[in-house]
């Protein structure tokens, strides 16, 4: 079953590896062409149900869902897409199933199955956690949070035009296994995702069996709906482990700009730690993309901050905000978050020598318009109430390779960000 021991070992070592600074990691270069074809193993058992649902969704959505300009056309397109997707054929996916009636999945077994599907691909990239602890050890286990724009399948194969990425590297049946492998490798307690267009037929059914409770909020006018053979709208998804947290309240937020409702969304949930009883708010968002929309993003960010101000009762509840902000640190929306009365700090600044500089990139791709290397993804946190105990280091340029992302090694054009948080002693009275 373990066709790539190197791939297996790199995955299993990630979760409980000690927080050492930048252990040596192999610089794996992306192949210029797909590996030679070899006979593929039989379809893995745990992935079979999701594969069947995904296939049903593709076979039923064979036309472009034209969005048009009218409200009636919008809702018609949404209804058509959802009715032809796996969600309508599997209504149990529309709500989180009762975990008592759900057969759990062994994470190691699912990891083995993903590895079997990926046996012709090069091993996954090695990344290491950087120890950022400056205080005494916490009495409670840290809260591991993963932020990741996983790249909507419809956009990856359609609109995004990754000219240096072979079509074979974007095949969903293999790319979804790369995504799952990344999640299984780092085992986050909380998972914040953007560009999710396979929630109902892949992530919700599989992650719920791994013990996660999930929430999905699609974009009202998802660009995925304009792509032929789409799997429905993309949106934000938030998952948390039910054995660690209890959901206190949840809000789906459609962001506004200049009082107008926009196409961008956010999810904000207040969770209670079952072990300590402490509460905190976790939010995920994905702001408007493209150059020229800086003021629009700024307005969306201000709206999100106002919503979070209300949800956290004026910063009384500790807050973590994950997102693809589509904004460099020089943009106004970044400055709004950095100077907010919510007292937020960006976790990945702590990896820099001075603790004040963002990474040089969180996304690196080549499109028809040219090469793009930007820092767009962030994990913000309440610096008065939370400590960052460790953060997952980013891939090096050598690891990413000359053809950039996505690739046979890595499933998205954005890198995942992973941080371990603990409560400060001063935050005892805040939750």
UniProtKB/Swiss-Prot annotation:
It comes from Homo sapiens. Its EC number is 3.1.3.108. Changing residue 286 to A: No effect on activity as transcriptional repressor. It is an enzyme of class 3 (hydrolase). GO terms for molecular function: 3'-5'-RNA exonuclease activity; metal ion binding; mRNA binding; NADP phosphatase activity; NADPH phosphatase activity; poly(A)-specific ribonuclease activity. This is Nocturnin. Phosphatase which catalyzes the conversion of NADP(+) to NAD(+) and of NADPH to NADH. Shows a small preference for NADPH over NADP(+). Represses translation and promotes degradation of target mRNA molecules. Plays an important role in post-transcriptional regulation of metabolic genes under circadian control. Exerts a rhythmic post-transcriptional control of genes necessary for metabolic functions including nutrient absorption, glucose/insulin sensitivity, lipid metabolism, adipogenesis, inflammation and osteogenesis. GO terms for cellular component: cytoplasm; mitochondrion; nucleoplasm; nucleus; P-body; perinuclear region of cytoplasm. Changing residue 195 to A: Slightly increased activity as transcriptional repressor. Lack of catalytic activity.
